[in-house]
Amino acid sequence: MKRLAFLVFFLVASLVLGAQGLELPKVGRGEIIVVHTGHTLSYNPKCLIPDWVAYELKASKLDGDAQRRKSFSPDPSPVLKGYAQAEHYDYTHSGWSRGHMLPAGDSKYSQTVMDESFYMTNVCPMEPSFNNGPWRRLEEKIRKWAVEYGTVYVIAGAIVGNNRHGKVGDSDVVIPDLYYKAVLVPYKGSYLTVAFVMPNEATDKRKLKEYAFPVDKLEKAIGKTLFYGLPKSAARRIKPYIPLKELGLY
């Protein structure tokens, strides 16, 4: 069974890395990788949330008439067979919202992609005013970058930290302390990168630039190489830098 599980992981990871999507991080041994039409994720069966969700966002795909689903459902991917998942009702009346990692607002171009964004593997417990405040403002800013630059590459992730918020629901879904998004933007023949690290707590009035973080420091904090498809020379040059002016983060 372990050999079969490793073979499945190897084949899926090879598929993911072979695609060379710039949004993808370096996949570690043992990660449970799920590839959907609109996003790729790494599932954490102990916490019942995704460790990260990566996706490409194109300006040409920001519009569409795909309909939001009325509820969330378990992810039917065969890769997840045998693993526990959270349920929609785990969040009901809990005081925590179902926070999208791949936003539904970025999924309107395809009903399939929209439906996938409502899998439980694409959501994490978020404090409601955070989900509807800084997290939403960041989603909107990233859409503006997609319009301006044509395509952006995004990875969203959860940082459990000290798990000071505990768990939610009968399934014991772990509530992360922090969330992050890292963004790769094509810029004048090269790229820019920026990360945002946000506490999972009641909203405050900080501007987005106050959450900005160099991607290389985020990588050290989470122990993962982001945007693994970038040439190393470009990564060394741009990851330590926060391009506040270039990206309009005033």
Regions found by a protein language model. Name each.
Residues 1-4:
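Positively charged n-region of N-terminal signal peptides that target proteins for export
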